[in-house]
A protein has these predicted regions:
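Active-site-adjacent mobile loop/cap segments within catalytic or ligand-binding domains
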Residues: 4-6, 10-15, 68, 72-78, ...
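Non-membrane alpha-helical structural segments and their capping/turn regions in soluble enzymes
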Residues: 23, 27, 102, 157-164
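Sec-exported extracytoplasmic/periplasmic mature domains
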Residues: 31-42, 66-70, 109-117, 168, ...
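Surface-exposed patches in mature extracellular/periplasmic domains of secreted proteins
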Residues: 45-50, 118-125
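Short, low-complexity, charged amphipathic interaction modules
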Residues: 180-201
Length: 201
């Protein structure tokens, strides 16, 4: 499948800034997500923009997706709310008519919920540019609230790579293989073996 992917806002047109900088962190998630989807066999079209205004970056993103005849267009964001009280994950779709997109949205929301994020469910809008100006099924993923203490603490624990894994799994319907952690410190290995043998209290 050919997926048009945009990692949120342009470096020249910042998004929300709270405890986390949406633009900076979402770009980390994007950079981790691309190779995961490629490894799963998908072609990724970079729909990011360097525009210095919102209309410019939105238009450039959907234009790239349309010009490349993508099968799906996905943009990644972080949310924000007054006073930092909002929390959780939500996925926006044009409407509820596409079963595939509904399923992907539900899987993504469930993956985030399993890690402690609030599940805000599927949302629908016919007025959001990414959803109405794209000629293919599209989705806006609001991963979390960048100004909420709970959400940002989870993010610091999970990391951009972990967030990307949850999105990739939601899109593909398959678990993303975890990288094995290699213990390189010999002392740690020796102590572990001794403890298993009962030689160390």
């Amino acid at each position: 499948m050919k997926i048009g992917l945009r990692g949120g806002h342009s470096p020249n047109c910042k998004g929300a800034i709270g405890i986390l900088d949406e633009q900076a962190e979402v770009r980390k998630i994007y950079n981790a997500l691309v190779p995961m989807l490629q490894k799963a066999g998908h072609t990724i079209i970079d729909c990011n923009s360097k525009s210095d205004n919102v209309n410019g970056e939105l238009t450039e993103g959907t234009n790239k997706a349309n010009e490349n005849a993508c099968d799906m267009y996905i943009t990644i964001h972080m949310n924000a709310s007054s006073g930092g009280v909002g929390n959780g994950t939500e996925c926006w779709l044009y409407n509820g008519d596409n079963d595939v997109m509904n399923t992907i949205a539900d899987r993504i929301n469930s993956n985030f919920a399993a890690e402690g994020y609030g599940n805000r469910g599927r949302k629908y809008s016919t007025g959001l540019h990414d959803l109405c100006a794209s000629s293919m099924p599209a989705m806006i993923i609001e991963t979390m609230f960048c100004d909420n203490t709970h959400d940002t603490e989870l993010y610091k624990k999970i990391g951009a790579n972990g967030i990307a894994e949850m999105i990739a799994s939601g899109i593909t319907g398959k678990a993303v293989p975890k990288k094995q952690k290699v213990i390189t410190h010999c002392k740690e290995v020796v102590l572990k073996n001794l403890k298993e043998r009962g030689s160390v209290p």
